UniProtKB/Swiss-Prot annotation:
One of its GO terms (molecular function) is zinc ion binding. It is found in: Nucleus. One of its GO terms (cellular component) is transcription factor TFIIH holo complex. Component of the 7-subunit TFIIH core complex composed of XPB/SSL2, XPD/RAD3, SSL1, TFB1, TFB2, TFB4 and TFB5, which is active in NER. The core complex associates with the 3-subunit CTD-kinase module TFIIK composed of CCL1, KIN28 and TFB3 to form the 10-subunit holoenzyme (holo-TFIIH) active in transcription. This is General transcription and DNA repair factor IIH subunit TFB4. It comes from Candida glabrata (strain ATCC 2001 / BCRC 20586 / JCM 3761 / NBRC 0622 / NRRL Y-65 / CBS 138). The lineage of its organism: Eukaryota, Fungi, Dikarya, Ascomycota, Saccharomycotina. Keywords: DNA damage, DNA repair, Metal-binding, Nucleus, Transcription, Transcription regulation, Zinc, Zinc-finger. The gene is TFB4.
Length: 335
């Protein structure tokens, strides 16, 4: 029977049962761009989908804290003007906002104190930031700060890992973003995300991604989950998102080798041009810094490291292909 058993379900020896008591850090990066969520609501016919995501996220965070009394959580928001810690509350926003008390109606007064502290802080900071962002929804140029929020999350993870070095704190990162029907992979800056991949690999921190709406494929985010042993899930609707959070996204890093996770059909491993930002399959590579280019840069210099390219090599690259004379004669006869 062992010969025909699915290798995914074969028994794996665990190093120690004591790892069950090791605390875990869950860091969540939430993209709260009002323009993206408004476009998603218009296409899907949903109302206040970002609120649905927030409610499901609160349940997910509470369940993570319930697994172990020493577990930690952090939530970072990515918006058009930068990033902000929603929990733990940053020092410059430590004051309570009494005017937002109506926004806390979804929290029970009889809730466990630790849950209540996290939920109240998260909701207060979220509504203050989201209302401020709504006033900038008509701004013509809005850049994605998702890569910056991921970098901040990994920085926070590294700091806590150093503080809890004696108990080997486990960590994982969850990214929740909303897609657009007109989105392009250029909005996700390739080099910062690659830096996040290298940092997460060194920290042994899996990066999971939930993408809601938009194109099913996301080149750089899929590369991120594949390289860090994470999970990538694309959802057409926010309905039932709590089911995905409580199943696929709740797998502890220590159990990912023995639990069958959702798999991606295919991952696009293409890179992006340093100059144009476009995704390219074939391009030029600087031999010094490995910078990828889709065009020959002006001045024959690398835009990343300023290395001077060999003029003879550039001349060969710019040289047009030579068509044999015999082929030209045949073409003329046919004409």
């Amino acid at each position: 029977m062992d010969a025909i058993a699915d290798p995914n379900f074969q028994q794996t020896k665990l190093r120690s049962t004591a790892t069950e008591d090791i605390p875990s850090l869950l860091t969540v990066v939430l993209d709260i761009s009002p323009r993206l969520w408004a476009e998603f609501d218009h296409r899907s016919g949903e109302k206040q989908s970002v609120t649905t995501v927030l409610k499901s996220l609160i349940v997910f965070l509470n369940s993570h804290l319930a697994f172990n009394s020493a577990n930690q959580v952090a939530v970072i928001a990515a918006f058009s003007q930068g990033i902000q810690y929603l929990y733990p509350r940053s020092s410059d926003t430590s004051e309570q906002n009494a005017g937002n008390s109506k926004d806390l109606s979804i929290i029970s007064s009889h809730m466990y104190r630790r849950f209540r502290n996290v939920d109240e802080t998260l909701i207060e900071e979220f509504y203050k930031l989201y209302q401020r962002e709504e006033s900038l929804i008509d701004k013509p140029v809005q850049k994605s700060t998702l890569s910056g929020a991921m970098a901040a999350a990994l920085t926070y993870t590294n700091r806590l890992t150093k503080e809890f070095e004696s108990i080997s704190l486990r960590s994982r990162l969850l990214v929740i973003t909303c897609g657009s029907s007109r989105e392009k992979d250029e909005i996700f800056q390739y080099i910062p995300i690659m830096n996040c991949i290298f940092s997460a690999t060194k920290l042994k921190c899996p990066i999971d991604v939930i993408k809601i709406g938009g194109n099913k494929q996301s080149t750089f985010l899929q590369q991120t989950t594949d390289a860090t042993n994470g999970v990538y899930i694309h959802l057409e609707s926010t309905n039932g998102i709590i089911q995905y959070l409580s199943t696929a996204m709740s797998i502890d890093p220590s159990l990912r080798q023995i639990i069958v996770r959702p798999t991606q059909g295919s991952v696009d491993f293409r890179t992006s041009c340093y100059l144009t930002g476009k995704v390219v399959a074939i391009g030029y590579i600087c031999s010094v810094c490995l910078c990828v280019l889709s065009i020959i840069p002006p001045g024959n210099k690398c835009p990343a490291c300023d290395s001077q390219f060999d003029e003879r090599v550039i001349a060969k690259l710019k040289k047009k292909p030579v068509v044999p004379k015999s082929t030209l004669k045949k073409v003329k006869k046919k004409v």
